[in-house]
Amino acid sequence: MLFRSPSTFPAALQDVDRVFLMRPPHLGDPKALKPLIDALQKQKRIQLVSFLSLLGVEKNPIPPHHKIEQYIEQAGLPYCHIRPGFFMQNISGVHAFEIQHFNRIVVPVRNALTSFIDAQDIGELTARVLCEAHMHQNTSYSITGAEAIDYWEVAEILSQELGRNIVYANPKPSFAKNYWISVRGLEKEYCKVMGMLYMMTRFKGAEKVTTDFEAVMHKKPKSFRQFVRDNAAAWQL
């Protein structure tokens, strides 16, 4: 199914009654998802749309997630917005290159705190929500780790677990964005959204710690230290 090709919707949605919706990183315009949401509204049998949103987005109209949540609710679809903090996988994914090659973390948030969450924990919670659709209709869950840490602490944990000195570069936002585009070759639209999210973090938009994960899953979310231990190979050459 292609978001920009409504002709692909009917076959993909045949016999579907529950939907997990995630905005592709390269689609910064929320209107790109509107045709699919309209198609879901016409299905008449959708029990739940679980949208992977963003922590704090209900109070922040700037990220595209805010408008997408509104589209879903305005369509009258039964929804469960999953609003996670920053994925731990950001450190083992898009930012792993600098750690592998230069032992540096290039993220422009100064000393701001982040309540990292493992994507695996998000996946488990989302699966439960979809399986228990009627128990989670018209709800929202803010999903975070059990603690908020800054990137100096991230660097310290990486150093301790990987056995080498990792430092936090603490770049300016303009430098980081130019680096991602010019040196890393990342897509401009992707870097625009990433820069916007880190600007939110810079102004304390990612430090909130919640207990929603534990309330739904009846266990604690994975710690960042355990995540590093489980994924140490991600930062090795």
What kind of feature is each model-predicted range?
Residues 5-9, 175:
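Short acidic active-site motifs
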Residues 9-12, 231:
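Localized chelating/binding microdomains
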Residues 14, 25-34, 38-48, 54-167, ...:
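Oxidoreductase cofactor-interface core, primarily capturing Rossmann-like NAD(P)-dependent enzymes
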